[in-house]
Amino acid sequence: VNSLAKDKRVVLYGRSEDWIPKSLTKISKTPSYIVDRNPIYKNTDYRGIKVLPPETLLDEKKEDIYIVITSGVYEGIITFLVENGFTAGINFCCSPEFRDYSLLEEIRNYEQEVIVSCSDYHDNTMTRYSRAGGGIYKYHIGPNEIERLVKGSFRQIVLAGEYLYAVEFVECKLYKLNTAFKVIAKYDLDAANYCGIAYEPRRNILILVNAARDTVSLHNADSFEMVDRLVYSDKNLNDEVTSQHHLNDVCVCDDYVYVSYFSHSGNWKKGIHDGGISEINLRDFHGKPLPVVRGLWKPHSPQLINGELCYLDSMRGRFYTNDQVLAGEFHGFARGLAFDGRFYYIGQSEDMYMSRRFGTTHNIMLNAGFYLFDAETKASRFYPMLDNMNIHDILIMEQ
């Protein structure tokens, strides 16, 4: 502001007893006058500065003044100024103090439809039971309405052209749905404990991850016929113990598949949490997976966003936009990640293993739901799903 108004007189628009004192600490010169539309303030003084009606601005040469908006109802003021030939940035701006307020207003008034997959059981004798039960939910931010679109216990969900595919954990089926969330088909899975799914459009293949067998399978998206299968290592077979790596979620970019897991060495059940993400080359599918991210604690939700591999270090509640940038940190078990071009969405589940985080955090949040998160400012808003327990995946249909 001081640079733009260097050779001009400063005028404040809006006699605000809140915003003017804050703004005056940032402006290096004393304002020439204040304008305000409220007739009760006409020709009065505020802090030694004359208050005049907005029409006063129309008699000024635009190049001689710089207007700083100091009213919370800035949208109407901006409209008035633009309609009268003033240019944003050149002739006027909002007070720098409005940055926080405007972000709050943006988040408060934001609307988005967020698809949430929930893996809760419907059987109240099961540990992962919740009152609402699992399913695919639509959370409409704005009116803040929750609707269950499909009943079930769902893990990862992916949009593949005009269809969606979702892994149903209890039925051991892959659901195929249209974009209205009508079930088109259910494909039998050849084993329990499938979790992750991704779609590679050039090959028209679905990539499925099994958390017990630690396998990555390729299926034709039209017929669901299996094309190939990679076993992450021979450790499960040799030891006759399942889920030693605990592969879970997956994403794909062109020829490369990225899969997250609890332990690269296969020792997480022994307390060795060397979790991470490995890259698998589809052109050399049975080659050795290449670890690209290490040192994570039960990670989930790898996603390619803006050309970078983003992921969640779930137990620590950390969100990374690449392996060097810790973009956000949350006080719960983070799983489920999406981006709509403006905000990130990070899912959070009730933490069944809170004692493992004692001493590592000052707060352990037990709510299920998701955050709307601005990575630049670290501002967030939490949208609770109080009758659910486990959020697995988040999807934004329209970006």
Language model regions located:
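Short coil/turn segments that connect the beta-strands within blades of beta-propeller domains
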Residues: 111-113, 161-162, 202-204, 254-255, ...
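Repeated scaffold domains used in trafficking and secretory/extracellular systems
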Residues: 100-106, 151-161, 192-201, 242-250, ...
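Beta-propeller blade signature
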Residues: 133-139, 272-283, 360-376
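Loop/turn-rich, solvent-exposed surfaces of beta-rich toroidal or solenoidal domains
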Residues: 297-321, 325-369
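Asp-box/WD-like beta-propeller blade repeats and closely related beta-sheet repeat scaffolds
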Residues: 184-201, 208-219, 223-249
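Short, conserved, GDST-rich strand-edge loop motifs in beta-rich repeat architectures
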Residues: 116-131, 259-274, 347-366
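Hydrophobic, well-ordered beta-alpha structural blocks that scaffold small-molecule cofactor pockets
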Residues: 1-105
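Surface-exposed loop and turn segments in beta-propeller and other repeat-based domains
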Residues: 189, 224-245, 289-296, 326, ...
